[in-house]
Each structure stands twice: as C-alpha cells, then as structure tokens.
Amino acid sequence: MVQHLSAQEIIQYISDAKKSTPLKVYVNGHFENVTFPESFKVFGSEHSKVIFCEADEWKQFYQKNHSLITELEIEMDRRNSAIPLKDLTNTNARIEPGAFIREQAIIEDGAVVMMGATINIGAIVGEGTMIDMNATLGGRATTGKNVHVGAGAVLAGVIEPPSASPVVIEDNVLIGANAVILEGVRVGAGAIVAAGAIVTQDVPAGAVVAGTPAKVIKQTSEVQDSKREIVSALRKLNNE
C-alpha cells in the first residue's frame, strides 16, 4: 500500500496553506481605460467580462471602479478554503462528474470514483478499487486493491484527534451500501461488510459481517462467487 501522510503532516499542510476565496465574476460595463490587476484572469469583450480572482482583490477593484459597472453577478462556492480539489490531469483512473477529491488524496491506477463520492485529504484509493455514488473516504482512510465501497458507505476520517488510527481496508473487500467503518478499524483481505452495517472492531480476513454493531455471521467461502465478484470491465480505460 501507498504510505500514509501522518495526521501531523496533514495538520501542518492545512495550517500553512494560504486560505482562498476564489470568485467567478460576470460583469458588464465601460472598461476601455481600465487596467486589470495581473492576478486577475480576464475573458470576454470590451464591455463584458468574466473574471477569475480572489475575493479580497475583487473588493479593492470594485471600490475603485464600481461607477463603471452596469451589471454584476458573482459566483462563490467556498470561503477561506485551505485545501483545493485534486488536479486529476495525470490520474490513470475513471473519475465521474460530481466526485469531490481533495488535494493530497491518492487515486491509484484503474480505480473508479463515482458521482457524489468524497475523497478527503490523505485518503488512498487502491488500484482497481471502486468508490460508489455518495460514498465517503475520510481523511487518511485507505483501501487496498480491488475493493468495492458501496453507495453511501462511510470510511471514517482521522485527522482530528491526530492520535487516532486510520481506517484500513485490505485487498478484495466488498463494503455494502450505507455501511459505516469507524476510525481505527482494519477490514481483512477478502472480507464482506453487509449493507448498513456499523463496524466498530477489526474484521478478520475472509469473514462476512453484518448488523449494528457488526458481527461475523459466516465466511466468504459460503457466499456464491457471483455475489462477490469484482468486474474488471468496469475499470477498463481507453488505453487498455
């Protein structure tokens, strides 16, 4: 598995990060003699602009030039944000629209992250692993290879308190929809976590657990192969 960032490293990263309030500004007006700051990204025609900038920089510009503006609309989706979304340009995985993956998360080759899934800072999605719709991997949560994390499932994050141990999901594990894996829990290779289970203790390799709190109900050898199959075709990319 890929090496974890420690809680202290993540805390330091967040603490040191320049907090950002980016704006997208749609503005009409008389800008013939206006010089825009170099930090602005400005698009459009002479009288109609789309501007990307920081909120404090826009405030200064607006105070100086508001008399030239005839129409204005501002989009802001965060305030004093410390962690940007991850640049996925070189990520060799299938990432669907609406997934939220923060910087310093690791997405390994052939993984799949579905719509609405959230991958927090320091989390690791292993090779060939699928994170289904609206599932959440909290800070430092780790999955191994060929894991399926079902829709709405939660792998608890552990950044605060920093002493807590992260969730670790070993290879070839199936986690059902809306299951919750609490901090510090390790789920052994090949195990199955039933839908809706709340897992408070380690799960042995090859076990099937269900309930609240989750308990071992049988072994995966007793489960039909078709009910625990990982489908490689769903992880296929264009370059394969």
Curated annotation (Swiss-Prot):
Single GO MF annotation: tetrahydrodipicolinate N-acetyltransferase activity
Pathway of action: Amino-acid biosynthesis; L-lysine biosynthesis via DAP pathway; LL-2,6-diaminopimelate from (S)-tetrahydrodipicolinate (acetylase route): step 1/3
Reaction equation(s) it catalyzes: (S)-2,3,4,5-tetrahydrodipicolinate + acetyl-CoA + H2O = L-2-acetamido-6-oxoheptanedioate + CoA
EC number: 2.3.1.89
PROSITE patterns: HEXAPEP_TRANSFERASES
Alphabetical keyword list: Acyltransferase, Amino-acid biosynthesis, Diaminopimelate biosynthesis, Lysine biosynthesis, Repeat, Transferase
Entry's Gene Ontology BP terms: diaminopimelate biosynthetic process; lysine biosynthetic process via diaminopimelate
PANTHER family per the UniProt record, alphabetical: 2,3,4,5-TETRAHYDROPYRIDINE-2,6-DICARBOXYLATE N-ACETYLTRANSFERASE, ACETYLTRANSFERASE
Function: Catalyzes the transfer of an acetyl group from acetyl-CoA to tetrahydrodipicolinate.
Family listed: Belongs to the transferase hexapeptide repeat family. DapH subfamily.
Protein name in UniProt: 2,3,4,5-tetrahydropyridine-2,6-dicarboxylate N-acetyltransferase
Organism: Staphylococcus epidermidis (strain ATCC 35984 / DSM 28319 / BCRC 17069 / CCUG 31568 / BM 3577 / RP62A)
